[in-house]
């Protein structure tokens, strides 16, 4: 799994504070920077709509299609995914679940099955079967890449659900990596979630 921050809102925390203060007829001097206490108190009160003015775009690579099936359920976001209809999938990479990987017998069978699927996929496409039809035999473990754009409010909702210990392991790993990146970029907005889900995992330079 690889996660890359492609783009994000410049001066997002100042923009968010200004949006928060306009609700009360006020404004803020951008030269002074964002007021951490003010923003975090407003978030604690549940007034999160101003967070929608901040946006992050991530490039996510080498994850399973099982993961992306879960990811796209978070609907207040924009997604663009590698297409198995147009892209060749011969010699596809795949994710091996830890529960299978730790058992050598299961792991060997898993790898052999993926090789058989790859061989059949290659045979079908070389025999004239269209990729859009040959792809039906590909496993959920197959690597895929996806771009994701979420506003800060939706990101916070995503992190609360998917960083939780009850979330499925692969999307939990993704969510934690995205949170690490989000916190390093915007510590005021994401500090509370970092402290809950990542503080004991590793430290982030901010």
Predicted segments — roles?
Residues 1-206:
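Family-specific signature for flavin-dependent thymidylate synthase
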């Amino acid at each position: 799994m690889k996660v890359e921050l492609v783009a994000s809102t410049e001066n997002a925390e100042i923009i968010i504070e200004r949006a928060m203060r306009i609700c009360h007829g006020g404004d803020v001097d951008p030269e002074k920077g964002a007021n951490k206490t003010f923003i975090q108190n407003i978030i604690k009160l549940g007034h999160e709509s101003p967070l929608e003015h901040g946006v992050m775009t991530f490039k996510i690579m080498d994850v399973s299609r099982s993961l992306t099936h879960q990811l796209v359920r978070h609907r207040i976001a924009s997604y663009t995914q590698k297409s198995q209809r147009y892209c060749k999938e011969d010699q596809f990479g795949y994710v091996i679940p830890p529960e299978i990987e730790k058992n050598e017998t299961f792991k060997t069978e898993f790898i052999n099955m993926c090789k058989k699927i790859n061989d059949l996929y290659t045979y079908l496409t070389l025999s004239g079967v269209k990729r859009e039809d040959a792809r039906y035999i590909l496993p959920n473990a197959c690597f895929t890449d996806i771009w994701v754009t979420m506003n800060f409010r939706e990101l916070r909702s995503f992190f609360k659900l998917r960083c939780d210990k009850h979330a499925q392991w692969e999307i939990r790993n993704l969510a934690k990596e995205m949170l690490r990146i989000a916190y390093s970029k915007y510590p005021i907005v994401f500090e509370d979630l970092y402290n809950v889900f990542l503080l004991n995992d590793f430290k982030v330079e901010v």
